[in-house]
Amino acid sequence: MDQDGEGVPVPRAPAADALVSSIDLGREVSDLDRRIMVALQQDGRASWTSIAEFAGASVSTVTRRGQQLLAEGVVRVGIVPTLGSEGHVESFLIRINCTPGSQVAVAEKLVESPYVRFVTLVTGKFDIFAEIVIPGDSAHFTRVLTGLQAIPGVERWRSDLLMHTYKVSFDWGRQLYDSHATAASDPQAYMPPPNTCDPTHFDDADRAIVAELRDNGRASFLSLASKLGVNESSVRRRYERMRAAGCLTTVTMIPASALGMSAETLLMVRVEPSRIDSVAQALAQHVSVRFLASSLEENSLYCEVILPTTETMHDFMTVTIAHLKGVRGWSASMELVFMKRGFIETPWWRSQVTTTDPAQISWDAAGSHP
């Protein structure tokens, strides 16, 4: 029996017609490419000059390679309003079982919803993990959640309130170049705490600027001014004011495989009630922990971890988590491909998920051998 008193389902593999593959750039990703990507995780709007200093290469080379990574869709930088900046919101962790073969179709519908901040296909007892952010009161919660539950292909739906977010970061790639890296990095790589931005900080001109930056977070102030029909200094001043007030979140999305990392895992860590905060504070110090929040369910912490290999993930679980005082146990799911993060759709997920006749999938195509 699992912790709900329910029979533990047999773990399901991905649907037979869904093959998840790594990103194929048609070329080798170099160490310089990776350094540029890690620098963009630190600050998605950093100048090519400052990125060149970190990467140890000329500005012209870094500019050319960086623009190529953006054009290829390997890196996407977007800027969105900080969670809660337009008023009170609540976040829900959603775990879904789908009818066989419908996982991708269900996930695609979730990607289309403006309430969905995060969507990923996973292994294990569930098929999909998602985060849904809903403004307003409980009546609105019911309308949104029941509406999404009606998506064709949803077989079982589990919703849990996320009570407190301890960490959201975008700089997990630092661990490639700093084996002693901790969470004490540039605050630009972190999402500001929710509800710290007064909604009065936004007017229609501010919203227009943020709307343009959503799909191209590296757009210059000059190009924004030209498109919006205002002067450059006004755009710059408004952007800096919103950023200083904690009203903006810079989202730099990079597939872990592009950085040579293969262990992306979602954990539900069960903790003694009196130890939830101390365990969360300890986990938040690890640069490999990208997201961490407390769940209403069973005194649990919901945690996303990104590490280089399965072996390093094994060490993280057995050496780090297992020895934290108060941890009772955990369940885990491997992320296969994430389709949306920070309310922004990833540009690569459709190429990673292909509909294929299972009889036509060779071992080489699947990236393995019998």
Report residues per predicted region.
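A compositional/biophysical signature of low hydrophobicity enriched in polar/charged and small residues
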Residues: 1-370
